[in-house]
Amino acid sequence: MSSEQNKTIVRRLLEEPWKGNLKVVDELIDRNYVGHDPSLPEPLRGPDGFKENVSNYRAAYSDARITVDEQIAEGDKVASRWTGRGKHDGDLMGIGPTGKQVTVSGLTISRLENGKVIEEYTNWDTFGMMQQLDVVPELAHA
């Protein structure tokens, strides 16, 4: 597949499930998918692991959405810089609803095989989310 085709696949995977279209996950993720994210205790495994993660966040942020801001592709890899937004109106990681609007940035590197995403490394501003929820204090300026 071309770099542009790979970017389209990854963009769809990053954006559509957050709009409620979980069916796209089965179309775009390989059954042997592994998703690495330091904010999670274990890697995500397969389409079901990906869907469960999205569902958990959508339960906490009913209007959750991700927008892909920029992508760079080379060979079988796509790097995507994205922004996630949503109103915290459900439980998340033991944190009850705060009603606060949250905006976070993240970066995902996706590896594709045969037109499907088989592995991803994601790093996003979990700490910033916790600050916006008033769970941890803002850092003092130097």
Spans of model-derived segments:
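C-terminal and inter-domain tail/linker signature
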Residues: M1-A142
